[in-house]
Amino acid sequence: MASVLCYADARGIPSHGCNRADTYVNEIAAGLVDACAEPTVERVEGCCALVDGRNGPGAVAAGLAMDTAIRLAGEHGAAVVCVRRSNHFGAAGYWANVALERGMIGMSMTNTSPMAVPTGGKTRAVGTNPLCFFAPADGDDSFQLDMATTVVPIGKVEVMDRIGRVCPPGWGVDRNGNDCSDAREICVSGGLHPLGGGADTAGYKGYGLGVLVEVMCSVLGGSDARDIGPTIRSWSARRDGPLGYAHAFVVIDPGRFAPGFGERLGGYLAGMRDLPGDVRVAGDPEREYERDAAENGILLHGNVARALKGLAARVGVEDLPGALEGLDGLGARSSLYE
């Protein structure tokens, strides 16, 4: 799990980085997540498999599922693996990147607790349900799409709340379904807009994508009825039972199709970047941020660093990186490799 958190912060995705550490620890401390659970591969049929997360940490179940998908894709050319009875698995891109590093196309997705208000509705009923697609190109290049199916992931709103800032217009709504910029209100009582916003700006497309992810994860994976869509428990240490999250992973070996995939993709991406203006492709900003983090360390907001120090004291961790010990009001840098 620590690797997943560092991956996110190192790529400039603080919503899924160390900002979430206390939530993971609180879940285990409250007995809501079984830290000792060992996920199992329940079923394998050709290039398809089903994993039971057994209410353990989501990252552990996701690791087993992606390893299984890569193995099956190596045998069959492509693979689909679903996971049920799991928990939050961190940034979806971390798991797609595992396939990318093996020279394969990787897709990862997960359902989440309902945070989005569907088009035409007034109450939250769909998760942020992220969808991720990574594809390798020649020259160490790649296409890396990692997106929530809401305007923003809820973690971004949580970060805005933690650092005391208001949200930009269009991110979410209050308890009455009206547009809202108060981060706490969006998180606690309101909800997020689907990707695209309201009906007049094609928010129904984001809503549809969110449902697509739900179908691929919980419906295809055989989750219990209460672990699908609107009835999934809130991701909180105060909830009354397991989350029952579900994930799906797709891995494709491009070498099983037309030769020259990496060269063609590399040429396509280069052509997009060469367009007039400042055109980048999915994954470029994160790679730039990661290069800086590898050289200078991961930048944490001061409030997040302070929360980490408090968490460390609570669980008895004493040997913190020096940057965290000497943090100031602007934040702290901790080495990517510490």
Residue map of PLM features:
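Residues forming anionic-ligand binding surfaces in small-molecule and nucleic-acid pockets
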Residues: 41-52, 64-79, 173-192
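N-terminal glycine-rich anion-binding loops that anchor highly charged ligand groups
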Residues: 1-17, 33-44, 239-244, 280
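Phosphate/diphosphate-binding glycine-rich loops and adjacent basic-rich segments that engage nucleotide
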Residues: 116-187
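Active-site cofactor/substrate anionic-group-binding motifs, chiefly glycine-
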Residues: 16-70
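Secondary-shell segments that build the walls of catalytic and ion/ligand-binding clefts
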Residues: 165-228, 232-236
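A generic, well-ordered mixed alpha/beta core segment in the N-terminal half of proteins
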Residues: 49-138
